[in-house]
């Protein structure tokens, strides 16, 4: 079932090694192809050789327009968050449906820690004026989470160069 795949995959995702990364990518690709009708239709349209894809670099990426015109989900779930693009092109914004914010936060936090260290060790400054003025930004969500986990007293958002928001 989709639920058992998600549970098993999540556990392995956060304990994976560099050696198992490619295998996890291919497994997730196969899952998305089987359980996301929009992604499957796109792969079929471009004649992606599904059974021959063995390396993560060969996995087809959906064009950004698909995120604007379709509700991209694998299976059925109520999203805990729906992030949207800034719409800088003046067109419809793209949307990202997040089923589980705990997994989402763990993912970007562990990614940060892999390269830098724990956010507690940093002063996190968010100077993102055009983003602060809109709702639904995944960047604001991630920076806010990093600020909350930082132990530095001057961490925070700044609307303009010196104004703390």
Task: Identify the residue ranges that each predicted region occupies.
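Nucleotide 5′-phosphate-binding alpha/beta core
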Residues: 1-84, 90-120, 126
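Conserved adenylate-forming
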Residues: 27, 124, 131-165
